[in-house]
Amino acid sequence: MLIIELLKAIFFGIIEGITEWLPVSSTGHLILVQEFIRLNQDKAFIEMFNIVIQLGAIIAVMLIYFERLNPFQPGKTAREVQLTWQLWLKVVIACIPSILIAVPLDNWFEAHFYFMVPIAIALIVYGIAFIWIEKRNAQQEPAVTELVRMSYKTAFFIGCFQVLSIVPGTSRSGATILGAIILGTSRTVAADFTFFLAIPTMFGYSGLKAVKFFLDGHHLDFAQVLILLVASLTAFVVSLLAIRFLTDYVKKHDFTIFGKYRIVLGSLLLIYSFFKFVF
């Protein structure tokens, strides 16, 4: 029944809206949830669905940060306009590693890593990394506490960390936040740049997935269009709340709790995978 499929779409949209911005892996969570709750659709649609519903999350970022990211915003001084263009240049530079590395390798990683065990391992490894980096940061102050002070070189290397998210379970936001902190930025700067970098990255990735879906000879029926729209709209609404939560959270707390969550979830997935294999 279509109503059941739409309820599932709402559920998946909630998962996407929460996990896209928290450093816990949205794709990993969607793959995990779909182990137990699946859309009654073909494999090609589900693979495309898992990526394209990110568009709702991206639009949420654009809405929240529209004035800050718009160089043509009325009332901005010449200096503010210049800084906005410089921010966009940093974002473009940070996209280069993904264009050169992640895009060509995407299909290979999708074929070999989109199942439970690699997701579990990635969750645990990056969970440990978050705990380690926060312990290190407790003993030193960040070198970059404002986004305008971030260098183009730092932006490029943050983009290199983003490439790591090609492995499901890594988390795009997790990889970029972790990389930014390792490179000396504050948590606030790391989170902000992660949000901004998501706009071209996720638009591009979602667009490529959609184009590939149609070039492979697939098409969307009315029910599938409705499922995509409902899931994307849900992801948009939930993302508005998740982004507000994370921006407020990082002002007073570190990412240790997310590291612990990743380790616990990854461990449970490994146990589940073991029993599923044995029995």
Swiss-Prot record:
PANTHER family: UNDECAPRENYL-DIPHOSPHATASE. InterPro entries: UppP (IPR003824). The chain crosses the membrane at residues 2-22, 44-64, 85-105, 113-133, 163-183, 188-208, 223-243, 255-275. GO terms for molecular function: undecaprenyl-diphosphatase activity. It is an enzyme of class 3 (hydrolase). This is Undecaprenyl-diphosphatase. It is found in: Cell membrane. It comes from Streptococcus pyogenes serotype M5 (strain Manfredo). It is a multi-pass membrane protein. Belongs to the UppP family. Keywords: Antibiotic resistance, Cell membrane, Cell shape, Cell wall biogenesis/degradation, Hydrolase, Membrane, Peptidoglycan synthesis, Transmembrane, Transmembrane helix. GO terms for cellular component: plasma membrane. It catalyses: di-trans,octa-cis-undecaprenyl diphosphate + H2O = di-trans,octa-cis-undecaprenyl phosphate + phosphate + H(+). GO terms for biological process: cell wall organization; peptidoglycan biosynthetic process; regulation of cell shape; response to antibiotic. Catalyzes the dephosphorylation of undecaprenyl diphosphate (UPP). Confers resistance to bacitracin. It holds the Pfam family BacA. Bacitracin is thought to be involved in the inhibition of peptidoglycan synthesis by sequestering undecaprenyl diphosphate, thereby reducing the pool of lipid carrier available. Its EC number is 3.6.1.27.
